Amino acid sequence: MNTATQASVSLTPEFIAATEKEITPHWGELGWVTYKRTYARWLPEQQRNEEWPETVKRVVEGNINLDPRLQADTVTPEVLTELTTEAQNLFRLIYGLAATPSGRNLWISGTDYQHRNGDALNNCWFIAVRPQAYGDSHILPSYLTQDQVAVSMPFSFMFDQLMKGGGVGFSVTPNNVHQMPVVDQTVDLTIVIDPESASYADSVALGAVNRSEWMHDNSLADVRFYRLPDTREGWVLANANMMDAHFNSTNPEKKTKVVLDISDIRPKNAPIHGFGGTASGPMPLVEMLFDINQILNNAVGRQLTAVDCTDMGNMIGKTVVAGNVRRSAELALGGAEDDAFITMKQDKDQLYHHRWASNNSVAVDSDFTDYAPIADSIQHNGEPGIVNLGLSRNYGRLIDGRQEGIDEAVEGTNPCGEISLSNGEPCNLFEVFPSVAEEQGWQLEDAFGLGARYTKRVTFSHYDWEVSRKAIQKNRRIGVSMSGIQDWILKTFKQRVVTGFEAKHDAETGKTFMQPIYNQAAVNRFNALYQAVVKADQDYSDTLGCQPSIKHTTVKPSGTVAKLAGVSEGMHFHYARYLIQRIRFQDSDPLLPALKASGYKVEPDVYSQNTMCVEFPVKAAHADEPAFASAGEVSMAEQFATQAFLQTYWSDNAVSCTVTFQPEEGQDISDLLLQYRHTIKSTSLLPYSGADFKQAPKEPIDAATYDAKCQEITADVAEKFAAMTGNHDQKDIELVDQSDCESGACPIR
């Protein structure tokens, strides 16, 4: 639990009212609707969701009060004045949508959930799948000591963080899975449930048995028995109990029977307090426990493989989705020469059952050159992605040269690949929209500096897992990002950042590659902004007496957050110059009448019952300028070159990028991966998909169609909703089938 502050900073109603008059939020075409259904929290006393100023106030106050100086016995007036001014600046910045913290912070910061759960403000995590000790953590199985290693630990970490709404990258590279012990014994798993439970019939249908009858016929003397409390931790510990029973080191009595009692788990549709939403009942957990136990039983007498470990991780992810977190973001990182791992999604039955739950990537270093089989798999399946651990461990920005071991503990990334992470470490994100910030009168150095300080404060949260606390205290890693990059480059430099290519011989491979030429003014500006972030972090670290951050900058994929401000997503190019963006709503959503009354096209979804599809016409920024290029027009080579530019001059962490390619470009994937092996820390590729099916999420249109669609919109939906409902809303209504990034890998909030 977070330590209560001795003094606190708050924003006055007078300040907020004055800011509302002074600044107009830069809502994108879908911005307000996306906000209302994603980040506006329910206010039970008023029977409505938050309005934007209330959300920003909550978020800013939740962050500014993490400053450790506020926990001192005596807090000076100077500190309170300094932090109040900073809170006001942050409010102006975020309220205007010139910048935002991560979607996770928009949803959680300033809530009771933040104070109860130390991990709450971090989007994503990384864990190495090898036997580890639980340490001084909020979860510790009763049969273990803190320093006793257990096979279950990385899976418990993964399960816990996914249920708290985070995403998890996990490594099943050979050096990790080879540390797994041989599976010693089969386990006879029994799941019992009270016949009075509302979940009884559904659970029995999945293999659970009547608790009263089982207890009458059996003794607990020779079994490992665990009665699950109705908590997140109970689900985690049930799985740990079953997993660890397979190994003599964590089951020295060699008991082969495990009995798990799920009678106390709340039934389906009961409210989940804290994170929000409603419960699934125990049924997804029952299915998962039997499935994971079967994998372990099948492995008796041998070590677990990367595929086994990924399957178990995917089954956990599947359970969390069914458990009503809505999405669980996973990235499995395997060996570049592990054919079984690389091809595991080709088994369609397993893919549809659980292997869909992770994006899969392979770990390489710059000496790796055999990209042909990987490129072939990418061309046909869009996977695996590439993560260059050697670059991540020894480089910040590429322009700063090799810095041996600067980040030597890195073992993987978060699911979207923009932050290289050590074992147990989270990403910690904030992004600035440079075009919007400049329009609203901000000096970009100041905006990025506020982002550095915001993320630095998050590192002073109290973290639930010892492995995370150690990594954060050592690294204080932050990830200040920018989004709308293509918009800002076109607006500022009047051309795209890649101005051409020139042939260059690669002595290592004997090949000739086309080396990109960059706009020098852009090089200089990105470099200056990077230095501003580093200076802001250094100055704040000096003030707080803590470690400067090991790395500072990144490019996150964005998506939902970029929609708020209506900017291009991360470094990605706009999907099209003009398009129809379709958003799906639950058919009971109170926003739908307001959308229809405002002139938006609303129709039943052709794929899902109880769902309505709404069309929003969207025009890309600078769509009519000669230098504009959409994702369907820009070459794969230019996308690689743009990612390399950002890795060289801006990001000392990594750059999240999903490179899209046309069918005729597939043959070039291998050579481009080879060309940029010394430059790009992580990347993924997907075929560019047009809108060749009904109600596609994005459908390119021409300018005339866009203008006609806009003519049909006769009112502002926020004003119409207020007029029709008095802003009274309905609890737990979300958009259907959202994704927060190009690859669909991120949690939304």
UniProtKB/Swiss-Prot annotation:
Entry keyword set: Allosteric enzyme, Cobalamin, Cobalt, Disulfide bond, DNA replication, Oxidoreductase, Redox-active center
BP-aspect Gene Ontology terms: DNA replication
The keyword Oxidoreductase belongs to this UniProt entry's keyword annotation: yes
Record keyword Iron present: no
Record comment: activity regulation: Allosterically regulated by ATP and dNTP.
Region described as Effector region-2: spans on this chain: 173-321
Obligatory cofactor(s): adenosylcob(III)alamin
EC number: 1.17.4.2
Region (Adenosylcobalamin-binding-1): 573-634
Chain segments carrying region Effector region-1: 152-163
Active-site feature positions: 416, 418
Family of this protein: Belongs to the class II ribonucleoside-triphosphate reductase family.
The name this protein goes by in its record: Adenosylcobalamin-dependent ribonucleoside-triphosphate reductase
Organism: Levilactobacillus brevis (strain ATCC 367 / BCRC 12310 / CIP 105137 / JCM 1170 / LMG 11437 / NCIMB 947 / NCTC 947) (Lactobacillus brevis)
